[in-house]
Design a protein with these regions (language model features):
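A short, Trp-centered hydrophobic/proline-enriched beta-strand micro-motif
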Residues: 46-66
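Gly/Pro-enriched, hydrophobic low-complexity segments
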Residues: 154-260
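Bacterial signal peptide processing site
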Residues: 22-25
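Bacterial N-terminal signal peptides that target proteins for export
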Residues: 1-10
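Post-signal peptide N-terminal segment of mature Sec-exported envelope proteins
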Residues: 29-51
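C-terminal motif of bacterial Sec signal peptides marking the signal peptidase cleavage site
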Residues: 17-20
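An acidic-aromatic
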Residues: 84-136
């Protein structure tokens, strides 16, 4: 029973996502964030981005699909930059019963016990979502990074693509000309940490909100040990909470999953 629940939880989450789809400087004229101008603040955020090549963690995942209470499972989260994001569910004695794998080619959801799987290429996902949905967007969300749709790497040359405005102790960053989607990021001006990412379908109430909490040290940087994903616009609230432990940058693991024949 548990392995079926895990498999359907992974599938439901992916379908819902597709459907909803301390430095000091002199004050400059124009918009200012603390002691920095708008462009200086963005430059600092980009230059200080950790850019980890890999991240692994033990994971506790709580999924609530109808507002009646979460279903909790344990497992592992593994990521290799520009290659793969793996979510492995192993509720009993470390035995994997389900896996979700996101790669630049698409999304694979697998029921290990019954050798069943769902595999969808990103080209098909883009058509379903009517937007530039790709691997690098999902990678940025999982890796706690600001991103620009359609770009693999964010550089200081992209600063003009963002609008920044102060919001109490935070800075609200929005992507200009986001086509079908509105992209918004909230960072803390004291430490520059990304606290929230939001993707909304323009002109509708549908969207996804990704909140980051409980930051922990990871190679002299900070990574969120808690991520809360909320899918907006559905009749019933849908949330997924990732609680992470034993954070590491270990790269010694198999990047891709063999599909059973």
């Amino acid at each position: 029973m548990m392995k079926r629940v895990c498999f359907y939880l992974f599938s439901a989450l992916l379908i819902i996502f597709i459907s909803s789809c301390s430095s000091t400087r002199s004050m400059k004229k124009g918009v200012s964030i603390g002691n920095l101008s708008e462009s200086e603040y963005m430059e600092e955020l980009i230059s200080r981005s950790p850019g980890w090549d890999a991240i692994t963690a033990k994971m506790s995942l709580a999924v609530d699909l109808n507002g009646k209470g979460p279903t909790k499972v344990n497992g592992t989260l593994r990521m290799k930059r520009d290659e793969v994001i793996q979510l492995s569910i192993a509720p009993f004695l470390g035995i994997e019963v389900a896996r979700a794998e996101i790669s630049p080619d698409g999304v694979l959801v697998m029921d290990r016990m019954n050798k069943r799987y769902v595999q969808v290429p990103f080209d098909e996902l883009k058509n379903l979502a009517k937007a530039d949905l790709d691997f690098h967007t999902l990678q940025a969300l999982f890796m706690n990074e600001i991103f620009l749709p359609g770009k693999k790497v964010l550089t200081v040359c992209d600063i003009s693509s963002f609008a920044v405005r102060p919001e109490n102790e935070n800075a609200l960053i929005e992507v200009k000309n986001g086509k079908h989607f509105a992209y918004r990021f909230r960072t803390n001006t004291n430490d520059g940490l990304l606290k929230e990412s939001h993707i909304g379908l323009s002109g509708t109430r549908y969207g996804i909100n990704w909140r980051y909490d409980k930051f922990r040290p990871l190679e002299q940087k900070q990574f969120p040990a808690s991520m809360t994903v909320s899918f907006e616009g559905a009749k019933q609230p849908v949330t997924a909470v990732f609680e992470l432990s034993r954070l590491s940058t270990n790269k010694d693991w198999e990047s891709h999953t063999e599909v059973p024949q």
